[in-house]
Amino acid sequence: MTLRNILPLALLLGGATLAGCNGGKSITPKQAGEIEILEYCASEDHKSDKDHFRASATGESISRETAKKMSRSNCESALARSINSTMEIVTDNYVNSSKFNNVEEVTETFNDLARTVVNQQLSGAITVCERLTQKADGSYVSYRAIELSGAELVSKYNERLSQDERIRAEYNYEKFKETFEAELAKQR
């Protein structure tokens, strides 16, 4: 064999080898249609039930700590909105079923006390789920769920209502608690 014969043969074998190396890769086709999204800290276990108020939220930032603070703040806001709307319903139902002299004034007092209690209790909300992810661009996403005990909330609310002289004479804790628990049971 001469150099003239070996050179074309070597090029042919080299080309075949290179072409064979590329054939082992499989190309994953793009998924068509709907794609299921996994939401951390947002399952059924992280929703309000008859015993607890719960809220979940996310926070995103290039700073890890800021993302975590944002998710906590967003959770607290969502939890406060949920509790406040429930307390307004409970107050309306309780006041309307009771015999208060001035319904509007009593309702306003109950709602003001509810907001005060909720704001004080939010700091005691317990984190029941927390996940932290980092995106390809380096930013962080914090997923969080928090909860607040319904029993603790109604107990603190009762404590505050019992201190209000305008309401104390006509206030019935057991009836209020029953109204509260009935509304909380609807959460599930």
Where are these regions (language model features)?
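Domain-level marker for long, solvent-exposed, non-transmembrane regions
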Residues: C21-R188
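Sec-dependent bacterial lipoprotein signal peptides
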Residues: M1-C21
